[in-house]
Amino acid sequence: MSQWRGLLQEYKEFLPVTEETPLLTLGEGNTPLIPLENLSKEWGVKAYVKYEGANPTGSFKDRGMVMAVAKAKEEGSRTIICASTGNTSAAAAAYGARAGLRCIVVIPEGKIALGKLAQAVMYGAEVLEIKGNFDHALDIVRSISEKEPITLVNSVNPYRIEGQKTSAFEICDALGQAPDVLAIPVGNAGNITAYWKGFKEYHEKKGTGLPQMRGFEAEGAAAIVRNQVIEEPETIATAIRIGNPASWTYAVEAAAESNGKIDEVTDEEILAAYQLLAQKEGVFAEPASCASIAGLRKQIASGEIKKGSTVVCVLTGNGLKDPNTAMSTIDVNPAVLPNDEQAFLDHIKGGVPK
């Protein structure tokens, strides 16, 4: 069995890789497509999750970042910069470290999961906090990158989209064709853009078919659904707490071209899906990821997703990215028992399986 060589080598023919592009990798890609056996029976569909939390820094951002950082290095850049709600900063810092580049990340004040911040710090990034939200941070780093010899690695960087589209290839490779529906969280909207690009390119080359693209924003940050910029977006799903998505137009096009839809889910629906996925399937994803599961559940109930459909839900990040949400949404009160085996047996026998 040959070792996975990373995206720049495995999907070279579909990527802007030249003889001069450094073949940077941390082993990103090749993430599992997990069938949801229990929930599929309950909902009457063939549901899978594309578990992007298995990437090196724990999120889908690694796919785009390896491409963006490799091209930055190829072009002679010495510094990369990004605005981030967390996952982008972790990926940029890791691949920046691997490539030997200086990395600067700008985060919204007090609005980032600690697991993600810890990663950026450990990888050696310079972390700056802005007194504002993600959209303010992105405005500043975009402006700086236009004036200084610093490479912006947010999803407005076209190389990010190129790397992220590879997940669509992997889904088609695993299933033998595209699913009927691709359900995906929408924050800055780069990922839905990338998946649609990937499905179209693979279909053109291999005849794998095209899915409906169904994207899900959090209700408190549903700029595309409401067709207006949300000045102060708010949601428990910090990774998609974005009120002015950079790839807004492309996301709308992806939904329209594929006969899909951009929809919204509430924080309550997201948290219910977050717990359901972990407790019914043993898959722990960060809250924002579970917008795709919440959306699937919502649209099965509404009849928009038909029974019997093959659906892939993208889980964008690992649950360990945001342990605080898990601890704050579920009561953690372990029973304290004496150091006595019989006491444990009595307790266990008295318990009723969930």
UniProtKB/Swiss-Prot annotation:
PROSITE patterns tied to this protein: DEHYDRATASE_SER_THR
Record pathway: Amino-acid biosynthesis; L-threonine biosynthesis; L-threonine from L-aspartate: step 5/5
N6-(pyridoxal phosphate)lysine modified-residue sites: K61
UniProt keyword Iron present: no
Record: residues binding pyridoxal 5'-phosphate: N87, G187, N188, A189, G190, N191, T316
Keywords assigned: Amino-acid biosynthesis, Lyase, Pyridoxal phosphate, Threonine biosynthesis
Documented EC number(s): 4.2.3.1
Molecular function as annotated in GO: L-serine ammonia-lyase activity; pyridoxal phosphate binding; threonine deaminase activity; threonine synthase activity
GO biological process: isoleucine biosynthetic process; L-serine catabolic process; threonine biosynthetic process; threonine catabolic process
Cofactor: pyridoxal 5'-phosphate
Enzymatic class: lyase
Coiled coil: none
Pfam family, one: PALP
Catalytic reaction annotation: O-phospho-L-homoserine + H2O = L-threonine + phosphate
Family: Belongs to the threonine synthase family.
Entry-linked NCBIfam families: thrC
PANTHER family the UniProt entry points to: L-THREONINE DEHYDRATASE CATABOLIC TDCB (PTHR48078:SF6), THREONINE DEHYDRATASE, MITOCHONDRIAL-RELATED (PTHR48078)
Protein task: Catalyzes the gamma-elimination of phosphate from L-phosphohomoserine and the beta-addition of water to produce L-threonine.
Name assigned to this protein: Threonine synthase
Organism: Halalkalibacterium halodurans (strain ATCC BAA-125 / DSM 18197 / FERM 7344 / JCM 9153 / C-125) (Bacillus halodurans)
